[in-house]
Amino acid sequence: MANTASTKSTRSKKAHARHAAAAAKNAPHVEAPAPSSDLPERVWLIGVVMIFVIAAALRMYDLNLVPLHHDEGVNGNFLMRLVREGAYTYDPENYHGPTLYYFAAFWPWVMRALFGKASMENYGLTTVAIRMVPVLFGLGTIGLIFTLRRWLGTIATLTAALLLAISPGAVYLSRYFIHETQFVFFTFAIVVSCLYLYEHRNPFCLIPAAASGALLFATKETAFISVGVLIIALAVTFVYLRLVRGKVRPPKAKGRPQPEVWSLGDFVNELGGPVMVSLCAVLAAITFAGLYYLFYTSFTLNPKGLSDSFQTFAVWKKTSSVAHVHPIYTYIRWLLQREGALLVLGAFGALFVVLKPTNAFALFAALWAFGLTAAYSLIGYKTPWLMLNFVVPLALIAGYAVQAIFELEARQWRVTGVVLIVALSFTAYQSIDLNFINYDNDDTRYVYVYAHTKRGMLDLVKEVDRIGKERTGGQTGITIVSPDYWPLPWYLRNYSRVGYYGRMAPSTEPMIIANSTQQPEVEANFRDMYQQVRSKEGDGAFELRPGVRLLLYERRKDLFPTEAPPSIKR
């Protein structure tokens, strides 16, 4: 009996092996490399720490240095209302989704709960505090790259993380209080969650993927573009590997090989069976719907926000047809100007993986990077911050290019070293130049500086604060008659008597801020009541942004008029 049982067991194992071999023959290889042997573990850990330190230093250094952009000022205004009044109502006309404001409101609310309202104002609602939100999401994106070590390779992962850490655009936008940094983080989080689902056969990974997807759609209306490109990139990767499966060989790196997926049914069984997969899918759907609902309805305070969230696509489509329109090749030109090393290395990496597709994830990353570049290029509406969407996957495939050079026949340390030194030196120079020297230079070479606020605006704010201290502090009145004034509402947030008229208006307040084009009207209407506070520029004006100059007037200290304000001459 024992021999019979043993014989049956042997036959069963052989039959199972034949079945598996036949299935493997018909399936594309999608192994994930396990590159722990590429570099010593100690080198890997030191590299991770050093890259994080470099990334944090570039992103956190002097966050007050660069004046807020127009859009940052608008976002800051929404945040102030949410923090101070607890009021936020989603409006599809108003600059994307609500997640940025709620993430940014967390710290001020904590400060108020622990130390009172004064601490909230002094330490919670500050330029440094609000810009720490994109800083943390930017660092989080780099952290996600390190989770790809088994999929990309050690050298590729470290290189990709370092390239993104010092990328001129990634650093610039990580110091920018807009939605883009957290948008790319959530996009990347979807990818990583799906990779963990595939690698570990854990259906509960559907839940973080769904949460990331909900937060992505609650951040910007362009989420459907990113998700669509990810799906297409995955499908093309699968089809391409099927077509060239005879040429695909497992990587030489040591480690546990990634299991093959014979069929959808086998995959479901490996995930725990139909019941477990269905349960996790339901939980994922509830997670997605719940987060989406909570954010767009202002945590149930504005039920109409849910229906309004679907109106945003029509608004976005209309907006994209009238403003910021650029030629189809614009993103490639901008990338060459500011992210040249990433683009060139990314192109080589894509070429390597297409010609020798031994790494499925690298192929997917190439399709993700250039797919997004193509998708956004086909849309007339183009802004530099949208490039961050494809800078991240470009960094991944650029890192793969460096590893591919390293693995050519013999270990090409010298060639790899030269490539890295040139790429990193050029990128680091551009990053420092852009972020700490020419951060407001509107020359076309500095593509990320897009209608940005000039540093002269901060001089205007300093003069306003000086006058305010000499008068009645935060109660000092300010009349703003200039039609262009953003981001001044953020910088004047602690002044309770500020009027934003956008045109000439009567005033007896201690200060008037006007556009330089309004100078004749100001002097005609206010006669000898006010004197101009001049900047260091020749005309005494303070430059707000290219083409917009502001004038500051202070009411004469010996005048405390009780009569009615003078009439305005039109």
What does each of the following model-derived ranges do?
Residues 20, 478-482, 500, 512-514:
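Short, hydrophobic beta-strand segments that form beta-sheet elements in well-ordered domains
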Residues 221, 474-476, 508-510:
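Loop/turn elements at helix/coil->beta-strand transitions in domains of secreted/extracellular proteins
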Residues 507-570:
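Aromatic/acidic, Gly/Pro-rich catalytic loop(s) in extracytoplasmic/lumenal soluble domains
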